[in-house]
């Protein structure tokens, strides 16, 4: 069942603001999101977060890195995943921060909804098995569950690669077609 919310925006977990203390490196600017929030999960744990916030900072810490010579920031951000698969130190610093951000988001979710499964999606599901398992382990490490939760909860990669959004949209469309037509009135 798809939970829509009053304004149709339920489940926008990427825009939940997360604690940044200990997540950002010394002198690292506060991450901003396209939605206008500062420090939400998407400002760190997304391709846009890499392009806009993480890569520019880490390139100042890894001077003369190949990614700094790419020219197009969007293209450079897309290349970070491949560098992570090769265990490049700059890319690993970025993915460690992303794992920490997702872990903190899952911790927040654990405290308000106590789910039995936490699914990890996005570009990481399209990486090598070794990198996927490393990233999943890092997210698990940064997710603080109570003992009772840790015993029963599962942290897993989304099945069928990154189709969760498409699946949810299809279910919502089907439910809308099957719902009785509501009478509308105008003033």
Locate predicted features:
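Short beta-strand scaffold segments in enzyme catalytic cores
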Residues: 1-4
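ATP-binding/phosphotransfer module of carbohydrate and carboxylate kinases, centering on a glycine-rich
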Residues: 20, 24-187
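Short, flexible helix/strand-to-coil boundary loops that buttress conserved ligand/catalytic motifs
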Residues: 6-7, 54
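A short, polar/charged loop-to-alpha-helix boundary motif
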Residues: 8-25
